[in-house]
Amino acid sequence: MERQPCREKFGLKRGPWTEEEDQKLTSYVLKNGIQGWRVIPKLAGLSRCGKSCRLRWMNYLRPDLKKGPLTEMEENQIIELHAHLGNRWSKIALHIPGRTDNEIKNYWNTHIKKKLKLLGIDPNNHQPFEHKGNVDETKIESDTKESNSQDMKQIVNEVSRQGNNDQITESTSPEIKDEIVTSCQSDYLMHNNDLMSNRSSNYYSPSFSMEESLSNPKSTGQTSFAVSIHEESMKQWVQSVDSKLPWDCFNQLDEQLYLSFQQNQSNS
């Protein structure tokens, strides 16, 4: 059998309670007690439903209600009860006399919950939060593993490019794979070292060293100045030479100079 709603369609008042209604309800309950909230409105002369009268009495009018903020002892008691009961505010209110479930719920959301978060405690399970440093360390380890795996893939690809892809197959044992990868790593490092040495040697001139430039800084400027003058003179000479001039005459001149040089050597 379904329960009939306590509020009728017409004739019931809604909205905030007045002082007159509070006095009627308080005087009736204190005189006759709580017999049943469905019949109290009619007996007390109120145009309210039973649920509205019950909530008004339990949350505002009963004489054992405590006024003012919750004490520190009540706050600790709420935390302990919440750890066992969770968000069952009506059951928590039964263990704290003079406080309503609505008052306890509001105080939890506005004060206790924020306080626990500042202390590093999760208000849902009352356990300390996980340290962010541990999460960062695990992240770094995972990133390192990923980078190592990428390096290994590059090495295997390098082996396949060199034509050694037949050496590594699915049936190859792990020991042989490690040896092949190690040899590839050494070859790869030697190749990189050779490239770096060649690149570094290109920065030095055969007729000019870094030690000389450090010991005599003036020589650096003089040498660069002389080289620039020589280059400019060569450019001017090439531009001034006639393009139709036969180059065979220079070969004959070279032979004559060579013969004269040999004669001088024989005479001496």
Swiss-Prot record:
Pfam families: Myb_DNA-binding
Source organism, top-level taxon: Eukaryota
SUPFAM superfamilies: Homeodomain-like (SSF46689)
Transmembrane portions of the chain: none
GO CC, one annotated term: nucleus
Tissue: Expressed in roots, stems, leaves, seed pods and flowers. Strongest expression in the stem.
Keywords in alphabetical order: DNA-binding, Nucleus, Repeat, Transcription, Transcription regulation
Residue ranges: DNA binding: 37-61, 89-112
Subcellular location: Nucleus
Function: Transcription factor.
Protein name in UniProt: Myb-related protein 315
Source species: Antirrhinum majus (Garden snapdragon)
Gene that this polypeptide is encoded by: MYB315
